[in-house]
Amino acid sequence: MKPLILFFLFIFLSCSQDKEIFNNLKKAEIPISSALQINSVHTDSGKVSSVLNSPKMLNFSNAIFPYYEFPNHIEVILYDKNNNKTKITSDYAISYSNSDLIDLRGNVIVSTHLRDTLITDQLYYDRGQEWLFTNFDFRYVSSDKDIFGKGFDSDKSFEKIKFLEVNGYVSLDE
């Protein structure tokens, strides 16, 4: 009788663990699709407004907060109304489907057509407002500036910049 009770106890416990594992797997976010060598061109009124390139994209549109993940590098090229381009690269990015935000992380570099460059570890890009911002440490380099700081806020062309907690040098015309 003892072996029979032990057998049923073993079966019951092992089944309940399997059910728990299964439930945890259902809760885990698993991409519903993936794609390799992404090249996505966005247009506005027949003109190219942006180009996104990445070696890999994971689609998590089944998540509670849907998003696309770019785990192995991303390059985004933004064009202004004069067809000048701003290039953004990073090691990793998440593009949130229910908002206009792209969260870029790791070796983030933004370069404009004037060769103004922002370097940081994390940056948000708001596609709707065409706005860049971070609260992380940054370095901003242009022909007459080399600024270090923590916190940066700007339009995509670096025409309206707000630096926070800065140090560095700026050339002034007298």
Label the model's feature ranges:
Residues 1-174:
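Mature-chain termini and adjacent capping regions
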